[in-house]
Structures are given as C-alpha cells and as structure tokens.
C-alpha cells in the first residue's frame, strides 16, 4: 500500500515537472520534502543534490541539504555546504561556527568508532583552535585518547579546560585517567569538588581517585555522597568494589551491586 502511494506520488511529480514551465525547483523541493517525510533519505539526498546542481544559490535547497547531511551523519557534506549557507544568509556567522564545530566533532567521533586513530589525530590537529577548546570537541578527543591508552596525554587537556570553566563531561573523564602523580591529580580533583560539592560527577571522580590511591574509607563516603546527589549504576558498582576492598560483608556488597544493576536496567540511569 505504501509503495503504491509512493509510486503515485512520484508519477504526479513527474507530470508536474513535465507540464509546469519554470517550476523545476519548486517541484523538486516538494519531492524532496515528501521523500524526507517518508524517511526516504537516500532518495531525498539524490533529489537535493540534483537541485543544488540546477540552482546552486537556492537558500531553501541548501538548508534542506544541510539538515539531511546532519541527520545522516554525513559531516563532510555539512562542511561542503557551509560556505554557501553563509553567503546566502541561511545562517549567520555564529550559526556557521556552531555547525562547523558540530561537524568536526561528528567526524572525530566517527573516526573513533572505527578506531581510525590516524584520522582522529589529523582531525584534531587540523581543527581551529576555538573548535579544539570547545567542550564537545575536547570531550570527544579525550575519550579517544583514553581508548588508545593515552590517558596521560588527556589529563593536561582536561586540567587546562577546568582552569577556565566547568564541564561535567570532562570532570567525569578525569576520573577514568590515572596520571603518574596520582596524589597531585587527586588534590586537583578535590579542589574542584570543594567548589561543586553537590555535583555527582566530580564526587564520582574523586571517589574513583581515592579508590586508586587506596583511601577506601574516604572513597566510600564520597561515592555515597555522589549517589545521594545523582544515583547511577556505575557509581554503585564503584562503591561495591570499594566495600569489597574494605572487607565488608557479602550481603552488603551484593545489595549495592543489585541496586546498581537495577538502575542500569531502568530508564532512570542518568548519563553524562
């Protein structure tokens, strides 16, 4: 039924295209919109790319093309259309910069997913300084470094960002890194915690670093605080590991693990 409706739609559009003088773009835009509404992304992309060839300056075609490229995670396509979006006043300079950063982050995350570390390094090095200093770009790059086992390179990048601002995401990543000077790393994280003592992410990070430093009693207290302000399955797991190291009872440890597992399986487990 849906296929027949789509075929009828296409035949009507072909007829309109053949009989409407000078309305190629209008008919093409309607066709692309209908294809998008039907989630026919590849067909819509082909239609819009053709329309761009026919009318390179058409602002609405450019806008639809950019939105579709973004939706399909075709980040190079987004970058290719950006200059025209600016020239045709579809986006102002701020919008162009935001979209450019989003596209660069998308490219870096795609390369990370493929474990294409050479491309990750290239994307990072070629990105403008302002883009590298953005939270989203830096967080994605830090994740990539951690996955490569290069956490020691990531640490200073997080610290430099945190000296100027705040990021729950980067604070969280800092707890997944272990630098050579663990005591200094812990002291730095505790300083951040003192400024944001009700933030579950910094509390989780400090708890992790205390555990790594074998300060288990303090780690337990901080992890319990983190759960108080923002319960997460991951935090319960860390707490259970600390309780195990402290020699707590099997019953107590199991109960904590169960709470964490229940939270992970529910839809209420907050994500960073």
Describe each region flagged by the PLM:
Residues 9-13, 48, 81-82, 124, ...:
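Inward-facing hydrophobic residues that define packing positions of alpha-helical scaffold repeats
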